[in-house]
């Protein structure tokens, strides 16, 4: 089916266009697609011409299978709507096929085909015979012209019968086509096709009986259906008789009788008469004279009873035929000696019983019975006088000497009636045989012996040989006691006295018994004679008694005769009433049966409709599957046909059957073709190599030898051409001379007529001049009228055109103005938008300049802060006391066990596990989004310029610094997962050298980290709408690595997640739920100070922020983790015992040993921590009790903590107890110094954040894929330290990279087991919260 949809009207038009150019096959394909289309399942009027054209093309191209498919489709379309259209189409199709066949028959000289079976035209015998005997042109023409059309016509009949079978709506058409098919078989003498046709009709009849429940099934009880079937079977019987196919005729007779038995009502008399007539012919042709005569008896009685207008002549003819047929029944029994010996009596009886059933007889007929019926029904009185005495001569009278002479007269009369009585001629041979047999029987009763010549003279109508044969047959079959003596040429009768006749011996005219019979019947004869003698000698009283009894019987009859007569009349009346009652009952029963049948049909029809709907659904499903298969097969077949048309494809697939080719894969076919192509190419190259050596020499030798021969042939041809030209030239000259002489003669003869011709022409012109002038005048008048009318029309038309043109131009002008107005408005909008964008760009540039100015001032202030820190560090170093430092070693150890690790330069716990390629990819995807939000929080809430610079509607591409090692930012629509993979067990995305603790969770209500007298505006207002990218209801703390030894995330009391502290955790007590203090930090910590309890600002990150500290990832500052413990050019000066020393002691517990801090610093740290705990207890009493429990646990753990091994590196197990409660409070002067340091560092950090943001916008382009894969901000700690050390002005010492890597690998191996327990849960939560969205520029945004 085509991929496009075509309407039926267009398809018919397309087909006609193809036919106009002589392309019948494409036209047929177009119509075929329409008929097979599922779109056209409802009948329309256009379908009928399409179907007629389709069938016409099928007939022209002899495509019987396509015609069959089209007819079946058309039947499905119009069966429920217009069945008459189907009948017209089928009749037109058969008419076209018959016309084509007749035309081929007229062109062919072969009237009757000698092909036995059209389905098997070429038999091995015919091929061999044609090869041996040869085939002339006419035979081949006849075979090519007539045979295909005859075969096509036969297939058309068979297909139409299959199409219309078992359909009550087209039953009449079915029988008409069947009768046409019988005529076709009879016309072309197609015996094999006749047999197939009979078998098909018989099969259709059996299917009718099996499928009688269908909605369109044929009801054989319907009289019309029965009559049509009987009519068709009678045509079949007649055709079989005409073609002398007696076996098929006998089967037809059985079919007809079967139809009779199906009917409850008797068939029509005319039909039965025709049936008996045909059956009699069949019986006679089959040699069964007994049933032939019986059939004629049935026909005779039927005609006498049913035909009211039977004439005397017809009565005589029928009676004569019945008499001759009855007398023609052989007297000899049909059973032979072989049948008697083989005991075939049962088979013969069964055969006769079946034949009797066909005639409606209860028992098989006999010759004697038929003769008695003929006499009883007075058939002889209607027989013609010439034949009337034949019965008496053969069956009654005993006159052997005159028998043959009398019969000969009758036979001669029969022979003289070939025109009037043609059917009587067939009985003459049988009558002659029966006459000879009667003669022999009568002669045997008279003569004991007779000469053969004498017997021959008594039978004049046969010769001696036929007579001798008849005698032998009579002796064998008729128990005739005769012996032939060839020496004396005599016949002897009754010489064997021991011979016993059979019971079924023929009986005829009888004169006396034979001697053997007399001996056998002697006792019987004696018995009969004695009975007669007894009657003679019987006494008189016995006779008197008999007479009295007779008289009593007569008197009794006379007495009761009237009463008996009345009883008989009453009985007749009773019988009549019973008949009427039975008829009424029959009518009532038929009516009830009809109603019941209608109800059953209605029920069957409903069930059939439901079944059809179900089948339609199933067929639709199967059709879809079949269409896919057909499309695939069609593609393969088309490809195969294209390939096989080529010489290469024919060779490649010559050994493969077409059925196998359909199952092959197109790739296999292509491979096969390529293989064959390569094979032929190789063979060709080999042949060329073999021939190229010899072909040049051979060609040169041929040409050298051809040169003299060509020259000589050229000279000979030139001489011949010259002679031919001279001869033709002479003939031309002679011919021209003769023609000139004849032309001169004609001229002289015609010149005498010149004057007469001129006179005739002049008269003719004069006569026609007036007529010409009159017509010219009329023409000029009409011309003037027409010119005037056309000028008026042209004027009116031009006026209308000018009017139309005016309105059209006016409309176009209005449309043009409207378009110009729209264009002008669009240009104005674009101009305003462009001005708006320029204004925004200008404002943005101004903000950038202001930011640069602020940054320059901040940078200058930063330098001053760093210089001040350096001086303070030197002062503190000079103020340290070596003795107090030595005494405070144990306090340093105590402070080393704090529950938060301080900044450690060489520690690996913040760096996380070693990076791998798959982890770096996922981290690169997550980092930009967090970094951008950090910048949003760091810029402050009241700085509108900084806020506008990070608005999401800013469509400019963000840029980054050239030294930025971070991955590319994501766009708002990027839907990639987090940059951390599902197995990423890293603690945080902050740098490995960042020692700041994470931000607190959403319930952080601590006060500001600024001093109470700090009058600077807050970094964000309380109404700052820039919230965290975490949801407000998520109460989890920031995510931490496995090596993070800080306390658990602070949250509400409803946090259902279990703690990740192990049972052996010996860390210090946790702080209260509302603890807002920052961790203990060193003086070199560049983050802002901790907040006090009065600051209730919302955390800079949302409650769900799982990132590390908000220190910028591209912070180019040198790590300050262990700088206090190492000698360097600058260290901020503080008094001993501060909290920075405590943090450094905590770092040393995780790194290599170094000198402990003074005890004064530890005391000061303890005082500071106690102040914070007091503030916490005042804010939340409930959390205070929990914190006290944890502190007691931490003190207990701290008391039993082992001292640190000073000998080398070690990894701390669980957190050791902290001594932060034992630190002493420092004076207010040191606290103010530290607060100022934190303010300075905060300003410096904000300045760097703004600088990074500006650099990102100004320098970075859109992220490339190579950058996303390569540029990762998760650099190794030692590499980043090296880079930052080079950029920073004050040089600092960095721990050796080798040691950092070793520690990293060691911590990775030891932390792997601890991370496995909670890693999967964390990854699943990350996947649930993550939704990556990618915009058009390649930016990815992670939405939670």
From Swiss-Prot:
Source species taxonomy: Eukaryota, Metazoa, Chordata, Craniata, Vertebrata
Family annotation (InterPro entries): EIF3A, eIF3a_PCI_TPR-like, PCI_dom
GO CC, one annotated term: microtubule
Assembly mode: Interacts with KRT7. Component of the eukaryotic translation initiation factor 3 (eIF-3) complex, which is composed of 13 subunits: EIF3A, EIF3B, EIF3C, EIF3D, EIF3E, EIF3F, EIF3G, EIF3H, EIF3I, EIF3J, EIF3K, EIF3L and EIF3M. The eIF-3 complex appears to include 3 stable modules: module A is composed of EIF3A, EIF3B, EIF3G and EIF3I; module B is composed of EIF3F, EIF3H, and EIF3M; and module C is composed of EIF3C, EIF3D, EIF3E, EIF3L and EIF3K. EIF3C of module C binds EIF3B of module A and EIF3H of module B, thereby linking the three modules.
Spans traversing the lipid bilayer: none
Pfam entry (one): PCI
Coiled-coil regions, chain positions: 82-120
Keyword Transferase: no
Protein's recorded name: Eukaryotic translation initiation factor 3 subunit A
Region of interest (Disordered), residue spans: 807-844, 866-1240, 1252-1344
Post-translational modification: Phosphorylated. Phosphorylation is enhanced upon serum stimulation.
Modified residues (Phosphoserine): 492, 584, 895, 949, 1028, 1149, 1159, 1223, 1300, 1326
Alphabetized UniProt keyword annotations: Acetylation, Coiled coil, Cytoplasm, Cytoskeleton, Initiation factor, Nucleus, Phosphoprotein, Protein biosynthesis, Repeat, RNA-binding
Biased segments, Basic and acidic residues type: 866-1126, 1138-1240, 1252-1292, 1300-1333
GO molecular function: receptor tyrosine kinase binding; RNA binding; translation initiation factor activity
Positions of the UniProt region annotated as Interaction with EIF3B: 664-835
Amino-acid biosynthesis among keywords: no
Modified sites of kind N6-acetyllysine: 68
One biological process term in Gene Ontology: viral translational termination-reinitiation
Natural source organism: Mus musculus (Mouse)
Residue intervals of the PCI domain: 315-498
Family, similarity comment: Belongs to the eIF-3 subunit A family.
């Amino acid at each position: 089916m085509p991929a496009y949809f075509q309407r039926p009207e267009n398809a018919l038009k397309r087909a006609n266009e193809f036919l106009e150019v002589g392309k019948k096959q494409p036209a047929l394909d177009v119509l075929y697609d329409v008929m097979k289309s599922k779109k056209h399942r409802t009948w329309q009027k256009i379908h009928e011409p399409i179907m007629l054209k389709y069938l016409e093309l099928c007939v022209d191209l002899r495509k019987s299978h396509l015609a069959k498919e089209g007819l079946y489709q058309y039947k499905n379309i119009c069966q429920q709507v217009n069945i008459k259209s189907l009948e017209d189409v089928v009749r037109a199709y058969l008419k076209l096929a018959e016309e084509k066949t007749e035309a081929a028959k007229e062109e062919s000289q072969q009237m009757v085909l000698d092909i036995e079976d059209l389905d098997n035209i070429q038999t091995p015998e015919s091929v061999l015979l044609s090869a041996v005997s040869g085939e002339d042109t006419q035979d081949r023409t006849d075979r090519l012209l007539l045979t295909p059309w005859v075969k096509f016509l036969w297939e058309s009949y068979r297909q139409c019968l299959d199409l219309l079978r078992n359909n009550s709506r087209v039953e009449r058409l079915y029988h008409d086509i069947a009768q046409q098919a019988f005529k076709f078989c009879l016309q072309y003498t197609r015996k094999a096709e006749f047999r197939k046709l009979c078998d098909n009709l018989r099969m259709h009849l059996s299917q009718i009986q099996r499928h009688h429940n269908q909605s369109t099934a044929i009801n054989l009880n319907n009289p019309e259906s029965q009559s049509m079937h009987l009519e068709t079977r009678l045509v079949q019987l007649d055709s079989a008789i005409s073609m002398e196919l007696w076996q098929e005729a006998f089967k037809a007779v059985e079919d007809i009788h079967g139809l009779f038995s199906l009917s409850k009502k008797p068939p029509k008399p005319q039909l039965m008469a025709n049936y008996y007539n045909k059956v009699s012919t069949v019986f006679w042709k089959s040699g069964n004279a007994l049933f032939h005569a019986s059939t004629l008896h049935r026909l005779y009685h039927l005609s006498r009873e049913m035909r009211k207008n039977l004439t005397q002549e017809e009565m005589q003819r029928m009676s004569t035929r019945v008499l001759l047929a009855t007398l023609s029944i052989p007297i000899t029994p049909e059973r032979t000696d072989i049948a008697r010996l083989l005991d075939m009596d049962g088979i013969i009886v069964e055969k006769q019983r079946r034949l009797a059933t066909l005639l409606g007889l209860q028992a098989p007929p006999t010759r004697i019975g038929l003769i008695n019926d003929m006499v009883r029904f007075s058939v002889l009185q209607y027989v013609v006088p010439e034949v009337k005495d034949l019965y008496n001569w053969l069956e009654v009278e005993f006159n052997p000497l005159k028998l043959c002479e009398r019969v000969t007269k009758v036979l001669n009369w029969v022979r003289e009636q070939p025109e009037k009585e043609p059917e009587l001629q067939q009985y003459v041979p049988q009558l002659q045989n029966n006459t000879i047999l009667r003669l022999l029987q009568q002669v045997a009763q008279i003569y004991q012996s007779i000469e053969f010549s004498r017997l021959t003279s008594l039978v004049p109508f046969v010769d001696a040989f036929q007579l001798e044969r008849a005698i032998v047959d009579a002796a064998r079959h008729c128990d005739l006691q005769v012996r032939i003596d060839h020496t004396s040429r005599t016949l002897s009768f009754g010489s064997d006295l021991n011979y016993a006749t059979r019971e079924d011996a023929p009986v005829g005219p009888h004169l006396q018994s034979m001697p053997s019979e007399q001996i056998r019947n002697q006792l019987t004869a004696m018995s009969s004679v004695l009975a007669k003698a007894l009657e003679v000698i019987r006494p008189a009283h016995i006779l008197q008694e008999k007479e009295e009894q007779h008289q009593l019987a007569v008197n009794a009859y006379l007495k009761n005769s009237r009463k008996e007569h009345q009883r008989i009349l009453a009985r007749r009346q009773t019988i009549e009433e019973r008949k009427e009652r039975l008829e009424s009952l029959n009518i009532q029963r038929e009516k009830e049966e009809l109603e019941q049948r209608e109800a059953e049909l209605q029920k069957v029809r409903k069930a059939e409709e439901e079944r059809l709907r179900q089948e339609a659904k199933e067929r639709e499903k199967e059709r879809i599957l079949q269409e896919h298969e057909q499309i695939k097969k069609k593609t393969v077949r088309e490809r195969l046909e294209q390939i096989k048309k080529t010489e290469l494809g024919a060779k490649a697939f010559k050994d493969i059957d077409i059925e196998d080719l359909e199952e092959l894969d197109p790739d296999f076919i292509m491979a096969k073709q390529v293989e064959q192509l390569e094979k032929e190419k190789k063979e060709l190259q080999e042949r060329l190599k073999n021939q190229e050596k010899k072909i040049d020499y051979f060609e040169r030798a041929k040409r050298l030898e051809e040169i003299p021969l060509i020259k000589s042939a050229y000279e000979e041809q030139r001489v011949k051409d010259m002679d031919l030209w001279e001869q033709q030239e002479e003939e031309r000259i002679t011919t021209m001379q003769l023609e000139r002489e004849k032309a001169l003669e004609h001229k002289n003869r015609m010149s005498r007529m010149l004057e007469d011709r001129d006179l005739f022409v002049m008269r003719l012109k004069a006569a026609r001049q007036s007529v010409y002038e009159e017509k010219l005048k009329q023409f000029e008048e009409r011309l003037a009228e027409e010119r005037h009318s056309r000028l008026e029309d042209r004027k009116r038309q031009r006026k209308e055109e000018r009017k139309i043109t005016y309105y059209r131009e006016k409309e176009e002008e209005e449309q043009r103005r409207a378009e110009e107005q729209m264009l002008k408005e669009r240009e104005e909008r674009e101009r305003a938008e462009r001005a708006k964008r320029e204004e925004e760009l200008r404002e943005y540039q101004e903000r950038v300049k202001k930011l640069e100015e602020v940054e320059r001032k901040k940078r200058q202030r930063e330098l001053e802060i760093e210089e001040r820190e350096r001086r303070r560090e030197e002062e503190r170093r000079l103020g340290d006391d070596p003795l107090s430092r030595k005494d405070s070693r144990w306090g340093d150890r105590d402070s080393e066990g704090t529950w938060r690790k301080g900044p450690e330069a060489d520690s690996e716990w913040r760096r996380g596990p070693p990076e791998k390629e798959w982890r770096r990819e996922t981290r690169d995807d997550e980092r930009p989004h967090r970094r951008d939000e950090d910048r949003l929080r760091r810029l402050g809430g009241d700085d509108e310029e900084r806020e506008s610079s990070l608005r999401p509607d800013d469509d400019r591409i963000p840029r980054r610094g050239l030294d930025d090692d971070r991955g590319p930012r994501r766009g708002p629509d990027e839907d990639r997962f987090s940059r951390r993979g599902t197995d990423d067990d890293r603690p945080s995305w902050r740098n490995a050298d960042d020692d700041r603790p994470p931000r607190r969770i959403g319930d952080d209500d601590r006060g500001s980290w600024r001093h109470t007298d700090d009058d600077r505006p807050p970094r964000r207002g309380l109404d700052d709408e820039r919230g965290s990218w975490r949801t407000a209801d998520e109460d989890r703390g920031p995510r931490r690595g496995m090596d993070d030894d800080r306390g658990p995330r602070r949250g509400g009391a409803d946090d259902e997640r279990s703690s990740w502290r192990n049972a052996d955790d010996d860390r210090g007590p946790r702080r209260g739920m509302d603890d807002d203090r920052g961790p203990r930090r060193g003086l070199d910590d560049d983050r802002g100070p901790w907040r006090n309890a009065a600051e209730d600002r919302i955390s800079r990150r949302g409650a769900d922020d799982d990132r590390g500290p908000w220190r910028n990832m591209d912070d180019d500052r040198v790590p300050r983790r262990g700088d206090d413990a190492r000698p360097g050019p600058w260290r901020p000066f503080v008094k001993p015992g501060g909290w920075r020393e405590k943090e450094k002691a905590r770092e040393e517990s995780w790194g290599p040993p170094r000198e402990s801090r003074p005890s004064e610093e530890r005391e000061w740290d303890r005082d500071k921590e106690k102040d914070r705990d007091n503030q916490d207890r005042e804010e939340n009493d409930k959390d205070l009790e929990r914190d006290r429990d944890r502190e007691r646990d931490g003190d207990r753990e701290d008391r039993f903590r082992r001292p640190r091994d000073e000998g080398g590196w070690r990894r701390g197990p669980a957190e050791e107890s902290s001594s932060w409660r034992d630190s002493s409070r420092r004076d207010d002067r040191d606290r103010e110094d530290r607060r100022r340091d934190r303010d300075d560092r905060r300003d410096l950090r904000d300045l760097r954040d703004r600088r990074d943001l500006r650099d990102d916008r100004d320098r970075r382009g859109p992220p490339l894929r190579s950058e996303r894969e390569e540029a990762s901000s998760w650099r190794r700690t030692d590499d980043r330290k090296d880079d930052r050390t080079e950029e920073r002005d004050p040089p600092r010492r960095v721990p050796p990279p080798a040691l950092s890597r070793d520690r990293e690998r060691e911590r990775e191996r030891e932390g792997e087991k601890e991370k496995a327990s909670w890693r999967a849960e964390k990854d699943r939560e990350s996947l649930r919260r993550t939704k990556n969205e990618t915009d058009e520029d390649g930016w990815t945004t992670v939405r939670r």
